Regions:
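Cysteine-nucleophile active-site neighborhood
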Residues: 5, 46-118, 125, 181
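Short hydrophobic/Thr-rich beta-strand motif most characteristic of the beta2 strand and flanking loop
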Residues: 29-35
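Short amphipathic alpha-helix with an adjacent loop that forms part of the alpha/beta core around
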Residues: 38-46
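Short, charged N-terminal beta->alpha structural module
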Residues: 5-26
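Catalytic beta-strand/loop cores that center a nucleophilic Ser/Cys/Thr
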Residues: 115-159
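Active-site beta-alpha loop architecture of Rossmann-like, nucleotide-cofactor-dependent enzymes
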Residues: 15, 56-58, 172
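Acyltransferase
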Residues: 172-188
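Phosphate-binding/catalytic loops
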Residues: 123, 164-175
């Protein structure tokens, strides 16, 4: 890992500190900033970045979209739930109501065995807590995983280490969360 620090943009979500706990198992220094309490110039360009889950929609996620726009070509970024929706919107995709809201449910995720899913069986079980989803996914983003209802569960940029997951790898209901984070941290 060339990067030794992680910046988490907290979108006022109760799962943010579950992400902190999961990332901390890798010995990385972590700083958490609320989405309206940090300026874009305060974020170092040599850190990993995680855009946390949160209530509402990406338009209510403070600095999150600006952080993605500024840093996606420079550092690895992982967006979780709302963070994935923000990534999609940065590239022109839309966020809409999910066909059926899914809150606190363990569902199967089917993936293509690449990048952040290396070494993880497909399908696997993951926790979902969302009423919104990415539809459509913006070009050039690539769909990596889907749920049984067809909702996109993971995306990535084809060139840069920019990833989004709709599910919650940090939840105790999710399998392989630690592997997903390790795979993300392997991008330096």
């Amino acid at each position: 890992m060339a990067h030794t620090e992680l910046i988490i943009i907290d979108n006022y979500d109760s799962f943010t500190y579950n992400l902190v706990q999961l990332f901390s198992t890798f010995g990385i220094k972590i700083q958490v900033f609320r989405n309206d309490r940090i300026g874009i110039d305060d974020i170092p360009d040599n850190s990993y970045i995680c855009i946390s889950p949160g209530p509402k929609s990406p338009r209510d996620a403070g600095i999150s979209k600006a952080v993605i726009e500024r840093f996606y070509t420079k550092v690895p970024i992982l967006g979780v739930c709302l963070g994935m929706q923000a990534i999609n919107e940065v590239f022109g995709g839309k966020t809409q109501r999910a066909p059926i809201p899914v809150h606190g449910k363990r569902c199967t995720v089917t993936h293509n065995n690449e990048s952040i899913f290396k070494g993880i069986p497909s399908p696997f079980k993951a926790a979902r807590y969302h009423s919104l989803c990415c539809s459509p996914v913006a070009c050039p983003l690539k769909v990596l995983a889907t749920g049984p209802d067809g909702v996109v569960m993971a995306i990535r940029h084809p060139v840069y280490p920019l990833f989004g997951v709709q599910f919650h790898p940090e939840s105790f209901l999710s399998e392989y969360g630690e592997v997903i984070i390790r795979n993300f941290l392997s991008y330096a």
